[in-house]
Amino acid sequence: MNDRPPTPLLDTVSTPEDLRRLKPADLRQLADELRAEMISAVSVTGGHLGAGLGVVELTVALHYVFDTPRDVLIWDVGHQAYPHKILTGRRDRIRTLRQGGGLSGFTKRSESEYDPFGAAHSSTSISAALGFAVANKLANKEGRAIAVIGDGAMSAGMAYEAMNNAKQAGNRLIVILNDNDMSIAPPVGALSAYLAKIVSSRPFLSMRGFAKRVAQKLPRPIHDFAKRSEEYARGMATGGTLFEELGFYYVGPVDGHNLDHLLPILENVRDGDHGPILIHVVTNKGKGYAPAEAAADKYHGVQKFDVVSGVQAKAPPGPPSYTGVFADALVAEAKRDDRICAITAAMPSGTGLDKFGKAFPERSFDVGIAEQHAVTFAAGLAAQGYRPFCAIYSTFLQRAYDQVVHDVAIQNLPVRFAIDRAGLVGADGSTHAGSFDITYLATLPNMVVMAAADEAELVHMVHTAAVHDSGPIALRYPRGNGVGVALPAAPERLAIGKGRIVREGKTVALLSLGTRLGEALRAADQLDALGLSTTVADLRFAKPLDEAMIQTLLTSHEVAVTIEEGAIGGLGAHVLTLASDLGLIDGGLKLRTMRLPDAFQEHDKPEKQYAEAGLDAESIVATVLAALHRNSKGLEESA
């Protein structure tokens, strides 16, 4: 049963201003009700549950102590922001999370003044908060900037780049390190909480600053010894030496579920003159919901579920997922070839490489949230004769574009890019859409770019990439399940730059790349019914193009249409360039390009997103009819 829980105290809180009217003694009850409301809401919508459960008390404490939205609160990634949304005027829509027309699953500037900076990709919060803090400093405006970042996100270099530049913000910048994997600190107790309260206080920080100023006037050897001694002592007590070296005052570790600990420490930091400050808060992902606490992934991402049992709704049986097909195909290749390695950037299960890791742990590398390193690491392996597959979501490969260009393409190193989540991705929306990889990869010399039309094609492309040693190669495939075709008993090596004719006709040529092939075939049925004989080609390659086949199709049909799940500048642009180079456009060629719109599309079901983008069968038919000046019945329209 998923009945809504009683929340009498939470019902009185619509905004943080309401929250700040409560007594501190009421906050424990509020946190419990907030947690229950979040569990109830996500049970209806699905989404990211575990991270939000882990920061309920921290969210309450931050909005209680700080004057949001004047004090800006920036959540890294945003998976943990559901409690924040409930407390900031969006509770009435919380059961629309990740639904078409509903709330985003991440923070979003256009959604609320309490979301000062949008997020979805990792490790951006400190840089953004630093920008807000320095802007306030330059304008002599009141207001702190608080970044909440998880310990996993601290594996990305960008977080340290920001911290290395943060000193200029002074006490206007506060970083909350949400350690929910116990990867940095041991369990916290009363002593560490007491020490954290002491070291966050104004007298301690003032005395420490005074001692530093005195030490700087001592002879150099004595000054250096004093500095090392203080760091050693504080490092033993708190583990904060690294952050101190980056110019932060370190406070913690603190029990992130104990409001009696959190409130005075946050108040001390708020009222202090010293900074920037890093508060190390230890939390438990999935806190307060037994099924989540017992699960290996702490219910990080869930389907709709029953609140009482925690049992998640299962999707109806269907074809295997593209991710699963890729993983199985790569494992099969690795069994035949011990030069094959697999690299992921903190997404082993999301990319399917957890299967590879179990089969070949010595050839599997999870480098953390470090896409730039992942690509150059793969380049180094390739330079030594190995066959690395770098499996990264399309949206995250954007973070390593310079490495793709400088370290891979220019040196023509045979790195294999397995690009998951290509095209539109549904509930995760614009921040996770794989819209741009065709454009930014196909423009590079030496690069080969493939797109699988179905799961069988994906198996062939994994094999083709595995044995391709003459330069870098990428294969892209979408989120979700395949179309249900039989998988090949043995993979084939595809000829580089060669497409295939799936259906032959005479009047219309549809040139499809990737999984829009199914819609192209549906459109062909409709066009044939209107008396317009239609050829459908699966180009397979965005680069190099099958120039001979494309030239034949363009010159032997009345109209040709390219169809792709990518942004402007991709397949269509390359086909137009080819037609121009061959002089085909001089003779009145009717060529149309269908691609994603020049806009960031909001979250919705993928099929609705593609219909909105004009990439469904009906839109293809309409494009053809318009090019031929025919009406919806296929009849010629008078000029």
UniProtKB/Swiss-Prot annotation:
Residues annotated to bind Mg(2+): 151, 180
Keyword Magnesium in record: yes
GO biological process: 1-deoxy-D-xylulose 5-phosphate biosynthetic process; glyceraldehyde-3-phosphate metabolic process; terpenoid biosynthetic process; thiamine biosynthetic process
Sorted UniProt keywords: Isoprene biosynthesis, Magnesium, Metal-binding, Thiamine biosynthesis, Thiamine pyrophosphate, Transferase
Lineage top rank: taxon: Bacteria
Cofactor(s) needed for function: Mg(2+); thiamine diphosphate
Binding site for thiamine diphosphate: 79, 120-122, 152-153, 180, 289, 371
Keyword Cell division in record: no
GO MF annotation: an example: magnesium ion binding
Cofactor binding, note field: Binds 1 Mg(2+) ion per subunit. Binds 1 thiamine pyrophosphate per subunit.
Pathway: Metabolic intermediate biosynthesis; 1-deoxy-D-xylulose 5-phosphate biosynthesis; 1-deoxy-D-xylulose 5-phosphate from D-glyceraldehyde 3-phosphate and pyruvate: step 1/1
Pfam family, one: DXP_synthase_N
Catalytic activity: D-glyceraldehyde 3-phosphate + pyruvate + H(+) = 1-deoxy-D-xylulose 5-phosphate + CO2
EC assignment: 2.2.1.7
UniProt signal peptide: none
CDD domains, A to Z: TPP_DXS (cd02007), TPP_PYR_DXS_TK_like (cd07033)
HAMAP family: DXP_synth
Function, as annotated: Catalyzes the acyloin condensation reaction between C atoms 2 and 3 of pyruvate and glyceraldehyde 3-phosphate to yield 1-deoxy-D-xylulose-5-phosphate (DXP).
Assembly with partners or alone: Homodimer.
Family, per entry: Belongs to the transketolase family. DXPS subfamily.
Protein name per UniProt: 1-deoxy-D-xylulose-5-phosphate synthase
Organism field: Rhizorhabdus wittichii (strain DSM 6014 / CCUG 31198 / JCM 15750 / NBRC 105917 / EY 4224 / RW1)
